[in-house]
């Protein structure tokens, strides 16, 4: 068993060895290194063929047409292209956008940018289990609403939104619907023929592919139009200029092919590990699972251990690679904005830790993690006067603290 144990799959995954092996064949002189846009010689044709194959593999995972897949540098760029691209293109129809307070920063920040440009954005409050109330979404829709952006699976708490139902509402009102599926692609079935979703952001490195490559699904029927955010040689049907990174695209394609093939196996494996970890720590008293436990991907377990500072717990678990919040915000000491949006008080939000597992996590690693967590939580609580008061039955919310 290799230490530290990696339990932060929601931040990034190791590249599957099968993917790495394939990528290496597209970089050097003895491989297929050409520019896929070079139309005048075999080096270019072979690279273009490799890109076409990857496009099909990615489309297959969504049951989409390969022509609906646009390559980008990752889900952040896809989110930006989808949100700003759609809002700008349809701005003559209206300037109102709807999203949710628990979205990833790559969705919230483009929305903030739109606000600076004069758009109006409604940020929905999720319920305390992290899920969106469809009635509230319906009530927020207006005649000038041009875009709804709701993530499929939340990166911090792993809850699954009802994308199919939201899609129905949007299609009824002829509103463009964007979904950030960075955390769900390869983990849950996504079928664009069944779901009325117009734009889907995808990332390779959350699906055992390389970092720095992603894609945006752009529906053709009914046709969705976007304003390009990256201008240049007109690659990717004008949606996204820039030479295609063949080796990364091949890696993403292979990763998505494997994910489709092994989805059920990966799901069952993660579920067994999730339940094992939860059963191993839930009797520690004052343990809360954040987010709905049923409507959730099995790869994620976000837990608050009351009276234990999340940061101190991370420090104590030096042999476990885990996180509090998302990797993008883990440098700030602010409590997680996602947990706050669930109506959680700062203390409990501060005491949360996210464990996320994947294809290469073993039962042995989970058992070791359980042991480490139990020791650390017990030790930290022994040091806490608040824990003593709680054990004595003092209601801490009624305590008046003296200011010095």
From Swiss-Prot:
<dbReference type="GO" id="GO:0044571">
    <property type="term" value="P:[2Fe-2S] cluster assembly"/>
</dbReference>
<dbReference type="InterPro" id="IPR016454">
    <property type="entry name" value="Cysteine_dSase"/>
</dbReference>
<feature type="binding site">
    <location>
        <begin position="203"/>
        <end position="205"/>
    </location>
    <ligand>
        <name>pyridoxal 5'-phosphate</name>
    </ligand>
</feature>
<dbReference type="GO" id="GO:1990221">
    <property type="term" value="C:L-cysteine desulfurase complex"/>
</dbReference>
<feature type="modified residue" description="N6-(pyridoxal phosphate)lysine">
    <location>
        <position position="206"/>
    </location>
</feature>
<keyword id="KW-0963">Cytoplasm</keyword>
<feature type="active site" description="Cysteine persulfide intermediate">
    <location>
        <position position="328"/>
    </location>
</feature>
<feature type="binding site">
    <location>
        <position position="183"/>
    </location>
    <ligand>
        <name>pyridoxal 5'-phosphate</name>
    </ligand>
</feature>
<dbReference type="InterPro" id="IPR000192">
    <property type="entry name" value="Aminotrans_V_dom"/>
</dbReference>
<keyword id="KW-0479">Metal-binding</keyword>
<dbReference type="GO" id="GO:0046872">
    <property type="term" value="F:metal ion binding"/>
</dbReference>
<dbReference type="InterPro" id="IPR020578">
    <property type="entry name" value="Aminotrans_V_PyrdxlP_BS"/>
</dbReference>
<feature type="binding site">
    <location>
        <position position="243"/>
    </location>
    <ligand>
        <name>pyridoxal 5'-phosphate</name>
    </ligand>
</feature>
<dbReference type="GO" id="GO:0051537">
    <property type="term" value="F:2 iron, 2 sulfur cluster binding"/>
</dbReference>
<comment type="function">
    <text>Master enzyme that delivers sulfur to a number of partners involved in Fe-S cluster assembly, tRNA modification or cofactor biosynthesis. Catalyzes the removal of elemental sulfur atoms from cysteine to produce alanine. Functions as a sulfur delivery protein for Fe-S cluster synthesis onto IscU, an Fe-S scaffold assembly protein, as well as other S acceptor proteins.</text>
</comment>
<keyword id="KW-0808">Transferase</keyword>
<comment type="pathway">
    <text>Cofactor biosynthesis; iron-sulfur cluster biosynthesis.</text>
</comment>
<dbReference type="Pfam" id="PF00266">
    <property type="entry name" value="Aminotran_5"/>
</dbReference>
<feature type="binding site" description="via persulfide group">
    <location>
        <position position="328"/>
    </location>
    <ligand>
        <name>[2Fe-2S] cluster</name>
    </ligand>
</feature>
<dbReference type="InterPro" id="IPR010240">
    <property type="entry name" value="Cys_deSase_IscS"/>
</dbReference>
<keyword id="KW-0411">Iron-sulfur</keyword>
<dbReference type="InterPro" id="IPR015422">
    <property type="entry name" value="PyrdxlP-dep_Trfase_small"/>
</dbReference>
<comment type="subunit">
    <text>Homodimer. Forms a heterotetramer with IscU, interacts with other sulfur acceptors.</text>
</comment>
<protein>
    <recommendedName>
        <fullName>Cysteine desulfurase IscS</fullName>
        <ecNumber>2.8.1.7</ecNumber>
    </recommendedName>
</protein>
<keyword id="KW-0663">Pyridoxal phosphate</keyword>
<feature type="binding site">
    <location>
        <position position="155"/>
    </location>
    <ligand>
        <name>pyridoxal 5'-phosphate</name>
    </ligand>
</feature>
<dbReference type="InterPro" id="IPR015421">
    <property type="entry name" value="PyrdxlP-dep_Trfase_major"/>
</dbReference>
<keyword id="KW-0408">Iron</keyword>
<dbReference type="GO" id="GO:0030170">
    <property type="term" value="F:pyridoxal phosphate binding"/>
</dbReference>
<dbReference type="InterPro" id="IPR015424">
    <property type="entry name" value="PyrdxlP-dep_Trfase"/>
</dbReference>
<feature type="binding site">
    <location>
        <begin position="75"/>
        <end position="76"/>
    </location>
    <ligand>
        <name>pyridoxal 5'-phosphate</name>
    </ligand>
</feature>
<keyword id="KW-0001">2Fe-2S</keyword>
<dbReference type="GO" id="GO:0031071">
    <property type="term" value="F:cysteine desulfurase activity"/>
</dbReference>
<comment type="similarity">
    <text>Belongs to the class-V pyridoxal-phosphate-dependent aminotransferase family. NifS/IscS subfamily.</text>
</comment>
């Amino acid at each position: 068993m290799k230490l530290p144990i990696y339990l932060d799959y929601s931040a990034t995954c190791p590249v599957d060895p099968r993917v790495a092996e394939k990528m290496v064949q597209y970089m050097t002189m003895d491989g297929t290194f050409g520019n896929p846009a070079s139309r005048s010689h075999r080096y270019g044709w072979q690279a273009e063929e490799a890109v076409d194959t990857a496009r099909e593999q990615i489309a297959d995972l969504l049951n989409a047409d390969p022509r609906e897949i646009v390559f980008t540098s990752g889900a952040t760029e896809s989110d930006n292209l989808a949100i700003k691209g759609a809002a700008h293109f349809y701005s003559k129809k209206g300037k109102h956008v709807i999203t949710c307070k628990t979205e990833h920063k790559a969705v919230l920040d483009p929305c903030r940018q739109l606000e600076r440009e004069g758009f109006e954005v409604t940020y929905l409050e999720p319920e305390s289990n992290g899920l969106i109330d469809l009635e509230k979404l319906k009530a927020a829709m207006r005649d000038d609403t041009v875009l709804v952006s709701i993530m499929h699976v939340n990166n911090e708490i792993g809850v699954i939104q009802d994308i199919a139902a939201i899609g129905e509402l949007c299609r009824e009102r002829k509103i463009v619907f964007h979904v950030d599926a960075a955390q769900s692609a390869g983990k849950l079935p996504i079928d664009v023929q069944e779901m009325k979703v117009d734009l889907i952001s995808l990332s390779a490195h959350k699906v055992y592919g390389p970092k720095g490559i992603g894609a945006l699904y752009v529906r053709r029927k009914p046709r969705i139009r976007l304003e390009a955010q990256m201008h240049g040689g007109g690659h990717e049907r004008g949606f996204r200029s820039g030479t295609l990174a063949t080796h990364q695209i091949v890696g993403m394609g292979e990763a998505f092919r494997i994910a489709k093939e092994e989805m059920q196996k990966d799901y069952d494996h993660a579920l067994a590990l999730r339940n094992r970890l939860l059963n191993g720590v839930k009797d520690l008293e004052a343990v809360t699972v954040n987010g709905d436990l049923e409507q959730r991907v099995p790869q994620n377990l976000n837990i608050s251990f009351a009276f234990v500072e999340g940061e101190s717990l991370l420090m104590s678990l030096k042999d476990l690679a885990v996180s509090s919040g998302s990797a993008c915000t883990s440098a700030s000491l602010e409590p997680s904005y996602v947990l706050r949006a669930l109506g959680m008080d700062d203390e409990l939000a501060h005491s949360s830790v996210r464990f996320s597992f994947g294809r290469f996590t073993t039962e042995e690693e989970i058992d070791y993690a359980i042991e480490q967590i139990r020791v650390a939580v017990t030790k930290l609580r022994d040091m806490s006067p608040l824990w003593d008061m709680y054990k004595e039955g003092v209601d801490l919310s009624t305590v008046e603290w003296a200011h010095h």
